[in-house]
Curated annotation (Swiss-Prot):
Its cofactor is [4Fe-4S] cluster; [2Fe-2S] cluster. It comes from the Bacteria. Catalyzes the conversion of dethiobiotin (DTB) to biotin by the insertion of a sulfur atom into dethiobiotin via a radical-based mechanism. Residues 41-268 form the Radical SAM core domain. Homodimer. GO terms for molecular function: 2 iron, 2 sulfur cluster binding; 4 iron, 4 sulfur cluster binding; biotin synthase activity; iron ion binding. The gene is bioB. This is Biotin synthase. [4Fe-4S] cluster binds at residues 56, 60, 63. The lineage of its organism: Bacteria, Pseudomonadati, Pseudomonadota, Gammaproteobacteria, Alteromonadales. It is an enzyme of class 2 (transferase). It comes from Shewanella halifaxensis (strain HAW-EB4).
Amino acid sequence: MSEVQLRNNWKREEIESLFALPMNDLLFQAHSIHRQEFDPNEVQISRLLSIKTGACPEDCKYCPQSARYDTGLEKERLLAMETVLTEARSAKAAGASRFCMGAAWRNPKERDMPYLKTMVEEVKALGMETCMTLGMLSAEQANTLADAGLDYYNHNLDTSPEYYGDVITTRTYQSRLDTLSNVRASGMKVCSGGIVGMGEKATDRAGLIQQLANLDQHPDSVPINMLVKVEGTPFEKLDDLDPLEFVRTIAVARITMPKSRVRLSAGRENMSDELQAMCFFAGANSIFYGCKLLTTPNPEENDDMGLFRRLGLHPEQGVASTKEQDEAMLAKAAAQQDKKVSAFYDAGAL
């Protein structure tokens, strides 16, 4: 098979034609590319932790963390360092190779940057890859996080430029692209994807993929989320997306961004094992691991490992550690949970 050529000049019509392929033809093309670029049975595992929850000033209609919607979510301050490290140790011992930290902010405040920098350094010292999603970043903030050793920064485009205004009005599409440019210029790896099932049309799903695939450099990681409908948000009563359209989105992402990790992200809790298996065949090779994604449900770890065994999949190996080191990390995490200490960072005012 000839080497896959990377492209950054996809036309909307080309991507729409991929979406329109018969399912067998689409899956064959996507899986062939997937096998050429990756071990088809290896899945990268990340753990996602909300380090600051709720009270976000943005109006994203899908998000339970927006201060504008009554979703019953309790807001929390920025987590204390040891609370974060306890979660990171537990994640590594459970098999995660990357630890992702998310904060419900429009953008991080300058006063918090030194603390965030230290957080990255401390998690890196555990031997894990690191990722953060903190909202918009200036070039200076991106450089600060890069200097700390942050491996990935996540900032999703969410949907197509045309449908974007129906999803969020408090942040422009261009501001998202600017943040991705700042991240890439800093030397960090880019994690960017979107959400499907938000009432968009098929052409909008094609438009999202077009925007991602036509970035100067493809995102290193592309999370594809299925909308999780949360009571109290404007999108709580939307009709469900046909699951096969979700599989098509995964497949088209794999074809247009052949060397990127495509992450089967939010919404897995509501997916059957058979649907997830189709997504892995279509080119998904990364998941979030653990019972919660920021504030929404996710499959239990044992369920994921059981599915992996049934499908013959295996986790990507992170930095090697001994059984004794893993047991020590778990013991330290358990001991920390027993301590009567604040879970929150004193200076992290909402």
